């Protein structure tokens, strides 16, 4: 089964830098099955995020690419999935990102 990976970033993404292969210290990693992501895609479309770099704003997750999720969007995502056990590893990461003002990087399928 296809998986989506998420990691808490150790720094704020910088303009002009692509994060196609983020190699920073991942403080926490979470894996979510594609089926669970697909069920929530319509709701995720309202999340203000960035595609590969903070220079390319987008809405929602880049399903097949890299998404940079800012802290406020992580909080919104947390409220969408906190009741869904399929997001078990990701739920505490989303909450931590919002509370500690950290970014999350998402690696799509």
Predicted region positions:
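Acidic (Asp/Glu-rich) sequence patches and key acidic residues
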Residues: 1-103, 108-109
């Amino acid at each position: 089964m296809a998986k989506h990976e998420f990691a808490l970033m150790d720094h704020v993404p910088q303009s002009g830098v692509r994060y196609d292969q983020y190699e920073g210290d991942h403080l926490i990693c979470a894996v979510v099955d594609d089926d669970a992501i697909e069920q929530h895609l319509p709701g995720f479309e309202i999340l203000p995020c960035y595609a590969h770099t903070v220079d390319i704003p987008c809405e929602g997750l880049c399903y097949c690419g890299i998404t940079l999720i800012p802290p406020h969007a992580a909080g919104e995502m947390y409220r969408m999935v906190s009741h869904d056990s399929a997001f078990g590893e990701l739920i505490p990461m989303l909450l931590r990102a919002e509370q500690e003002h950290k970014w999350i990087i998402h690696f799509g399928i």
